[in-house]
A protein has these predicted regions:
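Short amphipathic alpha-helix that is part of the acyltransferase structural core
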Residues: 1-40, 47, 52-56
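A conserved beta-turn-beta hairpin within the catalytic core of GNAT-like acetyltransferases
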Residues: 64-72, 79, 100-102, 130-135
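Conserved beta-strand in the GNAT
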Residues: 49, 55-63, 68-73
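Conserved catalytic-core motifs of GNAT/GCN5-like acyltransferases
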Residues: 117, 122-137
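Short beta-strand micro-motifs in enzyme catalytic cores
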Residues: 44-48, 69, 134-138
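Conserved acetyl-CoA-binding loop-helix of GNAT-fold acetyltransferases
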Residues: 76, 81-93
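Conserved GNAT acetyl-CoA-binding A-motif
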Residues: 95-109
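Residue-level recognition of conserved beta-strand positions in structured domain cores
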Residues: 73-74, 140
Length: 143
């Protein structure tokens, strides 16, 4: 299993295709959220993913917006294998050690709140609707 952290420009067309396919399969098809999955944030993000052979096991993107770092589009292709935890820990470590941020923000789907709390994120908003799915804002403070 290999971990990759790449900017948009560093991704090959095949890597980008596999990332977009996983995201569309998860967010558009599985979660029935027919909204724009590909956006301009991709151009400014670090794309972080775990890969085994040709398969992407987990993915997230890390980006800076309004002077704050954010993690989004978190996916584990197979649930309950630890891939989601591994990709989040990689993103947090990269953000704190390489990008030198003191905090990281996420907008988590409410059902995943406990997953993010185990990683050290704290809820800092009431639930809100985004594209028909309940979310909460959460923040991680680097220790």
């Amino acid at each position: 299993m290999n971990t990759h952290i790449k900017t948009f420009e560093q991704l090959t067309t095949k890597e980008l295709f596999n990332i977009y396919k996983l995201r569309v399969d998860t967010f558009v098809v599985e979660q029935q959220c027919p909204y724009h999955e590909i956006d301009d944030i991709d151009l400014e993000s670090h794309h972080i993913y775990l890969q085994q052979g040709k398969d992407i096991l987990a993915y997230c993107r890390l980006y800076k917006q309004n002077d704050a770092y954010h993690i989004g589009r978190v996916i584990a292709a197979t649930k309950r294998k630890g891939y989601g935890t591994q990709i989040m820990k990689t993103a947090i470590k990269f953000a704190s050690n390489i990008l030198h941020t003191q905090s990281i923000n996420i907008e988590a789907q409410t059902y995943a709140k406990k997953f993010y709390e185990k990683l050290g994120f704290v809820t800092n908003s009431k639930p809100f609707d985004e594209d028909g799915i309940q979310h909460i804002k959460m923040k991680y403070t680097v220790k």
